[in-house]
């Protein structure tokens, strides 16, 4: 049975994990790191770089490097590269493809099934887009799981049968979630969840960037925001400074040659940022985490003292100010230090993959929908059919009627959110139920059913009870991709995978050819210019043939025809072998001649053919 992986598709970093003998293992990527930057770059030569290689070249390729695309999931955002528009799903699929390849290299087998995590507060459009990204990457997405739920699963499964209440505080690179869960006897049940899909470590980085821009403008009189390359260097320096301030009281930000003045003289940026100053400029960001925390406690109907454990998830929770705030909010409770905040979500996803594949027994995961779902009714009111924090999968029906006499159809507009006025919420999609027989208003009976599957993806049906006519919508409008578009993107991704494979093979052939040319040139030089005391043993004719093959190989390497490089390499290999054989034959002939000479000169001497002395034996 093919194995399934768990993937934490993060805003700034992504992680893949797999079960080995029932235990989750985080898979290191091809660069040797356990986390992969969620960065995709389109190099000028047509190559697509993913992860650390993409991040490394960001400064010199700003316009063609895409990061933090998770913040655009479920929207109509696109980025244009070389005349082609890429959706967030396609960019995310590149990251997923790399994680898939790295996991396949580790396991030595193909992988198709995966559990992918999303922030608990992701709406339907964002979940649908994540699933589509998985499909484009060639993955069968078994389940979309909420990140805090996955973290609780990873944390709580080995904690015995005693029922416990766990608070998961998840502050990642681009999103924030807080969830309250109950774990006991193999059941992980989410009681309540809340969050902010536009709050994360990226925002803390951006504050440092703004602070540096203001400082530089005050000292040098130059606005760096107009220089894309300088801004990219500032972002990288800001991220580094933020990390350093988690363990130090101050950090030095030194960027030589950041820009030039009016006279083309190079200018340097050199600033000292203290932890106190950093906390001051980001205090409002920190305060934004309070409301979701209080909302979760209220929705779950518990008090802070009922919380048994606090689990921190996401690299941003390493900031001391975040840890201190969590302690304050939970009444002084010390957050659990036994989990790696960067890896725990992927570990939980791998466990859930094991549950779905039957490798992990006696575990039941009960997740919730993060936002209320409803339809727009007369007066633009949001009528909720499913309240937030309802355990999923779930199905709810309610009967509505017409607003006007002889109304032939009804427009069903599906919204997600907590506002009382429908238009203030997120419109997920709309569809029409037609063919309603003429009748006074209030007479037709229209049954609207909401069905949320285990991935948190919504299906809505409207049925006229009188005629039995019905219409169904699987909410997809939010992601903006039709099935045809997804299929096209899958084909594109497969084509790119073949292209990437071909590119790697081409690079291997080129490297082999260059190496063979270098080694053979060195060998020929040694034969032409023998060391002192040695003599030339190979004819000029043989060496000339090798020289000719070297020239052909060099010429082929100047071009891009891999077939020509292979042919030239084959010919050079043959000539190189012929050279080796000529050297061997010359050496053998010389040895024979020397032997004959030696034999004639010592015919009368006493020759001992072989005498073996065992010193150890003689000494006994």
UniProtKB/Swiss-Prot annotation:
Keywords attached to this entry: ATP-binding, Chaperone, Nucleotide-binding, Phosphoprotein, Stress response
Induction: By stress conditions e.g. heat shock.
Family label: Belongs to the heat shock protein 70 family.
Listed CDD domains: ASKHA_NBD_HSP70_DnaK-like (cd10234)
Region (Disordered): 591-620
Natural source organism: Mycobacteroides abscessus (strain ATCC 19977 / DSM 44196 / CCUG 20993 / CIP 104536 / JCM 13569 / NCTC 13031 / TMC 1543 / L948) (Mycobacterium abscessus)
Stored Gene3D superfamilies: 1.20.1270.10, 3.30.30.30, 3.30.420.40, Actin, Chain A, domain 4, Substrate Binding Domain Of DNAk, Chain A, domain 1
Chain positions with Phosphothreonine modification: 175
Record field: transmembrane: none
Compositionally biased residues, Acidic residues: 606-620
Tagged with keyword Hydrolase: no
Single GO MF descriptor: ATP binding
Name of the protein in question: Chaperone protein DnaK
Any one Pfam family match given in the protein's UniProt record, by short name: HSP70
Functional summary from the UniProt entry: Acts as a chaperone.
């Amino acid at each position: 049975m093919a194995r399934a992986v768990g993937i934490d598709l993060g805003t700034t970093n992504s992680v893949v994990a797999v079960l080995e003998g029932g235990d989750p293992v985080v898979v290191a990527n091809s660069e040797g790191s356990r986390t992969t930057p969620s960065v995709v770059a389109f190099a000028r030569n047509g190559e697509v770089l993913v992860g650390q290689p993409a991040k490394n070249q960001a400064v010199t390729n700003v316009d063609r490097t895409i990061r933090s695309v998770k913040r655009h999931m479920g929207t109509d955002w696109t980025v244009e590269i070389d005349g082609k528009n890429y959706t967030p799903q396609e960019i995310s699929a590149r990251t997923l493809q790399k994680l898939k390849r790295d996991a396949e290299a580790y396991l030595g087998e193909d992988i198709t099934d995966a559990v992918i995590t999303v922030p608990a507060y992701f709406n339907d459009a964002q979940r649908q887009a994540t699933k589509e990204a998985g499909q484009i990457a060639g993955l069968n997405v078994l389940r979309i799981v909420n990140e805090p739920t996955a973290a609780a699963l990873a944390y709580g499964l080995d904690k015995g049968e005693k029922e416990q209440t766990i608070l998961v505080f998840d502050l990642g690179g681009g999103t924030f979630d807080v969830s309250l869960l109950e774990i006991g006897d193999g059941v992980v049940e989410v009681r309540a969840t809340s969050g902010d899909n536009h709050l994360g470590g990226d925002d803390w980085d951006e504050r440092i960037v703004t602070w540096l821009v203001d400082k530089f403008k005050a000292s040098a009189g130059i606005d760096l925001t107009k220089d894309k390359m300088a801004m990219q260097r500032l972002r990288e320096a800001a991220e580094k400074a933020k990390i350093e301030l988690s363990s130090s009281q101050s950090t030095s930000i030194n960027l030589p040659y950041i820009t030039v003045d009016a006279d083309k003289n190079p200018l340097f940026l050199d600033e000292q940022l203290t932890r106190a100053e950093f906390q001051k400029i980001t205090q409002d960001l920190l305060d934004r985490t309070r409301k979701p925390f209080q909302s979760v406690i209220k929705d779950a109907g518990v008090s802070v003292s009922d919380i048994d454990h606090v689990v921190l998830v996401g690299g941003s929770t390493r900031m001391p100010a975040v840890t201190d705030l969590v302690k304050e909010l939970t009444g002084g409770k010390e957050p659990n230090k036994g989990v790696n905040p960067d890896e725990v979500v992927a570990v939980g996803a791998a466990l859930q993959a094991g549950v779905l594949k039957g490798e992990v027994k006696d575990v039941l995961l009960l997740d919730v929908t993060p936002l209320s779902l409803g339809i727009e009714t007369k007066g633009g009111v949001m009528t909720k059919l499913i309240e937030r924090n309802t355990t999923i999968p779930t199905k709810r029906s309610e009967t509505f009627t017409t607003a006007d006499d002889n109304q032939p159809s009804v427009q069903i507009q599906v919204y997600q959110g907590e506002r009382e006025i429908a238009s203030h919420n997120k419109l997920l999609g709309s569809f029409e139920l037609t063919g309603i027989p003429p009748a006074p208003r209030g007479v037709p009976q229209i049954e609207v059913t909401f069905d949320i599957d285990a991935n948190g993806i919504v299906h809505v049906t409207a049925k006229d009870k009188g005629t039995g006519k019905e219409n169904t919508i699987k909410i997809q409008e939010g992601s903006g991709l039709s099935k045809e578009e997804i299929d096209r993107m899958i084909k594109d991704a497969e084509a790119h995978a073949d292209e990437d494979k071909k590119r790697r093979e081409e690079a291997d052939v080129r490297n082999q050819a260059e190496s063979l040319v270098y080694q053979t040139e060195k060998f020929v030089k040694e034969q032409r210019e023998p060391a002192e005391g040695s003599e030339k043993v190979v004819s000029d004719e043989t060496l000339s043939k090798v020289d000719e093959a070297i020239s052909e190989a060099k010429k082929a390497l100047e071009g891009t025809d891999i077939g020509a490089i292979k042919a030239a390499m084959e010919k050079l290999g043959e000539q190189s072998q012929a050279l080796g054989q000529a050297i061997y034959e010359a050496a053998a002939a010389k040895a024979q001649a020397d032997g004959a000479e030696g034999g004639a000169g010592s015919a009368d001497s006493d020759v001992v053919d072989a005498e073996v002395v065992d010193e150890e034996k003689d000494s006994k």
